[in-house]
Amino acid sequence: MAKGMYHYVGEAWKKPTREMLQTRLIQWRAGESATVVDKPLRLDRARTLGYKAKKGFVVVRIRVKRGGRKRPRHEHGRMSRKQHIRKILKMNYQWVAEIRAANHFTNLEVLNSYLIAKDGKYGFYEVIMVDPDKPEIKNDPTMKWICDGANRKRAHRGLTSAAKKSRGLRTKRNTL
């Protein structure tokens, strides 16, 4: 069976070369934490997750700091048993990136996201966002569900794919 273009694009991203990402990572580290991108870097992944090249779709690159989430240490006084230095967030970095994108672009809704690169300090995600007020989105039969009021603030309520994965809702388990 013949393989299409998106298959080969996906194969190229499975083993990215160092030269391909090194200059981009340097630029991304120096840039802002939330940046609107003209087109998705991984077109195959974006199309799989629902991206369409039409009005109303926006791709945002988000930079998330990696590592443990620590609170500042007490300078004086005794620390109680309940108060720990390390904060357990129970959220994966991708969900954090989606929430930050939703906070930065309040008129858009998060559709999905994917990892594009990570280094020792940061993880970079592309978040696909949709403008629910655009007529192109309202008239699209496959995307008009996001205009419904029940899908407002999806990222904050844990309704995106990354949030469901982080909460363990991908598979149904026997709770007996």
Predicted regions and their residues:
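Low-complexity, rRNA-contacting terminal tracts
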Residues: 1-55, 73, 77-176
